[in-house]
């Protein structure tokens, strides 16, 4: 990976960009994953590169739903494995959820490489999706394959950085679907039951914190959080945040105000 000086004003953005490139070079991330990352980065600019209140609200509801679930599953793709492998394992443990590798551009080599990356952080972790035997109805070819003991039987599924038709297909199967997507206009964002509009590198650590904080909540408290959540309002609030932020920036001006030395 390219050595980026920490003094660089865009250090973290460049760092995670390099992680995605490294993921592709290792064989985990598909070429299309780089395009998807760039699109997400553009929306991160728009929201201000921070966790906004609608995302925090969505994360609390998502964690509550997972803590209530009987068969929770977290899906892992190439971008997730490249960006947050350690945090993915921490989140699965905090939510008592299973991990399943589920890929749009599936090859056995990619699956094996992603599993190896995850096991660097926990050699004993159970990873599903290695030999899937079931298929999501309506999804053809490799990308429709799921594990019988994972997504196939899950009641609640977290599908971060996911494509819209698979999100929709899971909802049609009766799954409660949570997604992490920086684009509030994407089909995944609009199809999911809970949409966390945040960068996954911020969202997963925060969800781990919330899971540890909320694990002792009563069932009634968790049900109340889920019951009061409105995903339509969350997405609308994200769009309003972007609108208001852009309006404020336009009014204040974004051009440099002084001569450079």
Curated annotation (Swiss-Prot):
User: What pathway does this protein act in?
Assistant: Cofactor biosynthesis; coenzyme A biosynthesis
GO BP = coenzyme A biosynthetic process
Entry GO MF terms: acid-amino acid ligase activity; ATP binding
The activity regulation comment is: Activity is not affected by 4'-phosphopantothenate or CoA/acetyl-CoA.
**Pfam families from the UniProt entry:** PPS_PS
Please tell me whether the keyword Cell wall biogenesis/degradation is annotated for this protein.
no
Top EC class for this record: ligase
Q: What is the effect of changing residue 17 to A?
A: Strong decrease in activity
**What is seen without this gene?**
Only viable in the presence of CoA or 4'-phosphopantothenate.
User: How does the record characterize pH dependence?
Assistant: Optimum pH is 6.5.
Binding-site residues, ATP: 17, 39, 181-183, 187-188, 199-200
Its EC number is 6.3.2.36
- Coiled-coil annotated spans: none
PANTHER family, per this entry? Answer: 4-PHOSPHOPANTOATE--BETA-ALANINE LIGASE
- Spell out the subunit comment: Homodimer.
Protein's UniProt name = 4-phosphopantoate--beta-alanine ligase
């Amino acid at each position: 990976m390219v050595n980026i000086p920490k003094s660089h004003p865009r250090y973290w953005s460049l760092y995670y960009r390099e992680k995605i490139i490294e993921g592709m070079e290792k064989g985990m991330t598909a070429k299309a994953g780089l395009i998807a990352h760039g699109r997400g980065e553009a929306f991160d600019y728009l929201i201000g590169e921070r966790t906004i209140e609608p995302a925090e609200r969505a994360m609390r509801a998502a964690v509550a739903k997972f803590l209530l679930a009987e068969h929770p599953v977290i899906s892992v793709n190439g971008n997730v494995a490249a960006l947050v492998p350690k945090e993915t394992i921490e989140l699965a443990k905090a939510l008592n959820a299973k991990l399943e590798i589920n890929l749009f551009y599936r090859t056995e080599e990619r699956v094996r490489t992603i599993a190896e990356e995850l096991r660097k952080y926990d050699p004993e972790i159970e990873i599903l999706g290695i030999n899937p035997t079931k298929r999501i109805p309506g999804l053809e070819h490799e990308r429709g394959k799921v594990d019988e003991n994972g997504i196939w039987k899950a009641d609640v599924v977290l599908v971060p950085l996911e494509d819209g038709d698979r999100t929709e297909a899971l909802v049609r199967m009766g799954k409660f679907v949570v997604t992490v997507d920086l684009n509030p206009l994407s089909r995944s964002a609009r199809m999911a039951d809970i949409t966390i509009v945040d960068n996954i590198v911020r969202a997963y650590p925060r969800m781990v914190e919330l899971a540890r904080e909320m694990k002792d909540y009563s069932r009634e408290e968790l049900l109340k959080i889920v019951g009061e959540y409105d995903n339509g309002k969350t997405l609308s609030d994200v769009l309003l945040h972007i609108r208001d932020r852009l309006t404020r920036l336009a009014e204040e001006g974004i051009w440099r105000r002084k001569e450079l030395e």
